[in-house]
Amino acid sequence: MAWLRLAFGNLRVNRRRTAITLLSVAVGVGGLVFLWAFIDGINAQMINNMTGYVTGDLKVHQRGFHDDREMNIALAERWNLTEEVSAVAGVAATTPRVTGHALASREDQSRALQVMGVDSATEPRVTRLDRSIVRGRYLERGNEILVGVDAAGALDVSPGDELVLVVQASDGSIGADRFEVVGVFETGIKRIDGFVAQMPLAAAQSLYAFQGRFTEIAARVQDADRLDEVVGTVGNQLRDRNVEVLGWPALMPSLVQMVAFHDAVAYIVIFVVFVVVAAGIVNTILMSVLERGREFGVMMALGTPSSRIVWLVLLETTVLAGLGYLLGLVLGLSVTGYFSSNGLDFSAYIKAMDTMPGLSGIVYPTIEAQRLVVIGIVVVSVALLAAALPAWNAGRNSPLEAMGARRTMINRIRRIHWQVTSDHRLLIFAQMALRSVFRNPRRSMITASATAFGLAAYLFLYAFADGFFEQMIQNSTQQLSGHVQVMAKGHDVDLSPDLRIAD
């Protein structure tokens, strides 16, 4: 406790320098907390929306269906797989489905849709599309269909209107039927609002000639962190049934890669911030050691072991980093808490966000406790590593060398001399500046290195982002769209054959 009081007292000797260092650490930590929460919020939203609106946490298919998507690779109702999966520990809910594609049309409007035939009683326990209805109601029975707000706009339909769906049935024939639009949903995700539709399971089985069968069983797990364990348990339970059990990472590998990419960008930025924070801490500790050379010399002359001097310097560093971390935590949690409640509105960039599956126009940062622990451990560790050299220098000198260290440095600087006349005031100021720099060359080198690293990191991140977006533009224009397209008005939205340019 006495050493801790001494460490706090030493930090109060130069309060301005300590305050500046604390502020730099706090701003760095606060920025890291918010950045990590922001990226975690993006990733969590993509995962929650895609699993919550479409896939569920896991699916059971007949083996081969996921790769080939052929309708004749189906599960039979008589196998009672839904009941078996529901009985597995860790599974919260299950629902059978028939999924396929259809061409929906009304008068002169048409659009391709991904159709999901669902059990209206069990589907809401696995997904939440029923809670996103903005007009009309959810499915009940008969030839009813639920469409997204973008699809409804493209097809010009509202609840009460009819759509004609044309499909290729499981037996290879062409199936068609009329369906009443009973509801319109809005998730804020273009690829769902524009291209996903639901109908009652029996209606889908009739449309696709799928009586007594379904393409998949979707399930919701009780604990998302135990998904792999539950997938393995379900797979073992059904190992004799020639089925495959896939969790959402296997169902949506592009989403997994997108999450990994976001994490990689976060780690790069975090590394840059940590280096800058370390430079600020080592600067403070180095100056403290230099200015207190006489104090350390007296302590060693009175019998204090050099190891205790090193311990004192490292303790001061730990206190400095710890206080900076706590202040940064308060700052970061305050900012993150505000935006977690109110969200960050990126609706102006909704077109760009369409490239990230499941991401809507408003992002809500999420805080994970383990991230805060990691930041705290790394901040203190980086600070101790940065202070190791100054601490070792403070403890390795003899009492006489320690007491004369500062005077020796000052005398060495005074020997640096330039013959400058009074008419060259600019050179006089340059001489004074150089003397200040060379007064502590090690500190100056650390500061210059930190500045150079920060600039290099900024240029790298800027070039990385610039190259990333430039590559996206080039790949899209060279391989697909070209630089300019001429089309009938509205064709880019509806993709209707009727919206064509006359010969």
Show the residue positions of the predicted features.
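Hydrophobic secondary-structure segments that place a key small or acidic residue at a functional site
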Residues: 98-100, 111-118, 132-203
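C-terminal membrane-exit region of the final transmembrane helix in multipass inner-membrane proteins
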Residues: 362-413
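Mechanotransmission and gating elements of multispan inner-membrane complexes involved in transport
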Residues: 169-266
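N-terminal Sec/SRP start-transfer signal
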Residues: 1-33, 43, 307, 399, ...
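Transmembrane alpha-helical interface segments in multi-pass membrane proteins
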Residues: 286, 297-340
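Hydrophobic alpha-helical transmembrane segments of multi-pass inner-membrane transport and secretion
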Residues: 15-42, 260-295, 318-327, 378-385, ...
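Short helix-loop junctions at transmembrane helix boundaries
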Residues: 327-374
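Hydrophobic, regular-secondary-structure patches
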Residues: 30-114, 135-141, 456-503
